[in-house]
Amino acid sequence: MKALAKLERGPGLTLTRVKRPEVGHNDVLIKIRRTAICGTDIHIWKWDDWAQKTIPVPMHVGHEYVGEIVEMGQEVRGFAIGDRVSGEGHITCGFCRNCRAGRRHLCRNTVGVGVNREGAFAEYLAIPAFNAFKIPPEISDDLASIFDPFGNATHTALSFNLVGEDVLITGAGPIGIMAVAIAKHVGARNVVITDINDYRLELARKMGATRAVNVARESLRDVMSDLHMTEGFDVGLEMSGVPSAFTSMLEAMNHGGKVALLGIPPAQTAIDWNQVIFKGLEIKGIYGREMFETWYKMVAMLQSGLDLSPIITHRFAADDYEKGFAAMLSGESGKVILDWTA
């Protein structure tokens, strides 16, 4: 089958031919329709330090997808040939304390599709049936293919009550932008997002941001004053991994505020702990998606009017993957979709 793989230890990916995956007793085989390019895939493309330490070579990658079940293992129940599915990209052990307690997103033995094992940038993907998730017919293939990052945004944004609250989001990547739409959809009052990328800040405005702030030109404090915010933000969603963004967030939080961290800052990042301790801030680390509560919430929000369509800005045939990665690398894109049926 055709697949997009890391064949050698260096930058780039190669469209190649690989063996179609075998299907275990508890697996489903998915014929891929669409995939989306993730920031993780950009790290793999660039072959940065993280990728060099993490990605086995050779291996085909990718973990954001939608497709159709074409084969099932003999032990699989609850699915049928022809079901349209996306799937949870974190494969968990099922035996550790968190898995057995129903907290699979906290599994200490997680294996990542397209990171630690063969991925979805291919004509077929085999995964455990437990990880597959049926997509309702009213949700398009394009939207279904971005359920993985949409789930990151949902898990982060819904970690705390947002109804009537003022929300600060630092980092206008696709996940941060989707978090804007989620926060407004569930009833936040002011949703302010910061970045230095004007293209993506404009996308955030289209997704409903109260203010999209280029912090290279505009003061967050001035924006807060314009919005008549006298006490600071109630909820912070840190999506960038940029130390200065996290610092500014802590300074802008109200006493008793709550912060969810999805962005990954450098290991030795220092912060002013006085901002945390004396403000009584609650800080929560976010990884992946809750299995499968996050997935059900994603579907429910889309079915109740959440519009994520502006975040998908580019579409290419899978054979034109280099154009897709170029769009992502330019910084002037939202989500980029690759069509494996074209």
UniProtKB/Swiss-Prot annotation:
Annotated site residue numbers, Important for catalytic activity for the proton relay mechanism but does not participate directly in the coordination of zinc atom: 148
Entry EC number(s): 1.1.1.103
Matching Pfam families: ADH_N, ADH_zinc_N
Catalytic activity: L-threonine + NAD(+) = (2S)-2-amino-3-oxobutanoate + NADH + H(+)
Coiled-coil annotated spans: none
Record-linked Gene3D superfamilies: Medium-chain alcohol dehydrogenases, catalytic domain (3.90.180.10), NAD(P)-binding Rossmann-like Domain (3.40.50.720)
SMART domains registered for this protein in UniProt: PKS_ER
HAMAP family, A to Z: Thr_dehydrog (MF_00627)
Entry protein name: L-threonine 3-dehydrogenase
Native organism: Burkholderia lata (strain ATCC 17760 / DSM 23089 / LMG 22485 / NCIMB 9086 / R18194 / 383)
Organism classification: Bacteria, Pseudomonadati, Pseudomonadota, Betaproteobacteria, Burkholderiales
